[in-house]
């Protein structure tokens, strides 16, 4: 399919070039046959043909030698200008050469010379027919360039604008990682890769820290039904997270700690299996600390920290 598209675009450019050359050739022959230098209207069409041929030759060289030199903003404007020139040339030439038929004569049997604006005895039949044919080919040039403008907008301008917005209008193909079709310049030979939109419809979310925890796991979790738990190789503790409250139970049933973590900056660490510690908070908000040592002051190691700097410490006998 891409090969068929490339052949079609190449044939389109070749048709534009051939039609432009035909318009120039037909008008040049007509002007020479009439023995005149032409008029402003005819010369305008002739100049349009010259501009078109030069543009197509320059474009072909650039597409072959520098296909990454895109600058779609300038390229699209140039293509559109040539198209509008052919529209104006078609209208002007049809007005100058198409008002009268080549076989029409006046009352004296004289033929009208469109270049001099006078009636002569010479019909200049072949020159007149060449001028009429130039009108048809100038209209064909306009249609062909109109098609190329549309294709350029669809195949090149639109993808670049979708990916790079307005900044892509004035960027080279090398900076965007693409290049033009070598034989036509009407498509990207290396189109941009389409990026699939992110779909999170099957992802369940839950704010565990805010108390809205559920069994849903993130997509990267191998087991979607598993809750997160701490894996302790010695089997000494198991941690469960529920509504920002943390309960830790050691393997020794004699030592248990329960911490209501109201301040994330606090931490409590205990390493003695014989010390018993209790933390409590009364309704007024003041904290009290009680410590009971069952086997002497030096029977175990204990370290604790709290975020309350003004706590009351009472040691039980």
Swiss-Prot record:
Pfam families: MARVEL. The chain crosses the membrane at residues 14-34, 50-70, 72-92, 134-154. Residues 1-13, 71, 155-317 are cytoplasmic. GO terms for cellular component: cytoplasm; membrane. Residues 239-250 have a biased composition (Low complexity). Residues 35-49, 93-133 are extracellular. Its main location: membrane. Induction: Induced under aerobic conditions. Keywords: Glycoprotein, Membrane, Transmembrane, Transmembrane helix. This is Uncharacterized membrane protein YDL218W. It comes from Saccharomyces cerevisiae (strain ATCC 204508 / S288c). The lineage of its organism: Eukaryota, Fungi, Dikarya, Ascomycota, Saccharomycotina.
